[in-house]
Design a protein with these regions (language model features):
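N-terminal intrinsically disordered, cationic/polar leader segments
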Residues: 1-86, 91-138
Length: 138
């Protein structure tokens, strides 16, 4: 992974074979990122995406093992119990089909190019139990 900062903005390049959420969590820890939003594009070989089921109180996940483009990646990083918590959603496409949802795992196949913006003047954290801790501002 590579990171190139300019002010509160960073170009993050996640490399082939890296797991996206783990890489972003490590990046946040190493760069003291406590509050940020990000978006990006790239390609993957494997994803595990889901949707939150309100009645069950958890996510229902499906795993896909195929080469897909990241048509859209968006998310945020906020602290939960003092550690970076990455929350990401994605839209993935391959051979005329698209799928997406809440990202649980995402293995990069070539590169993932992310624009991340730190929120310098707003203190945001996550409070509550996993899998869906709520945002708390202030």
């Amino acid at each position: 992974m590579q990171a190139h900062w300019t002010g509160q903005n960073c170009l993050v390049l996640v490399d082939k074979g890296e797991e996206l959420l783990s890489a972003l969590k490590q990046f946040a820890e190493e760069n003291q990122v406590a509050s940020a939003f990000f978006y990006g594009v790239g390609a993957v070989d494997r994803i595990k995406v889901g949707v939150y089921n309100e009645s069950l109180g958890n996510y229902i996940y499906t795993e896909y093992r195929m080469h897909m483009e990241i048509s859209s990646l968006t998310g945020n990083i906020f602290l939960h119990e003092g550690r970076p918590f990455v929350h990401a959603h994605g839209l993935f496409s391959s051979s005329g089909m698209s799928l997406g949802g809440h990202i649980a795992e995402c293995e990069i196949s070539r590169v993932c190019e992310i624009h991340l913006t730190k929120l310098a003047d707003i203190k945001v954290s996550r409070k509550g139990a996993l899998p869906l801790p709520r945002l708390s501002v202030g």
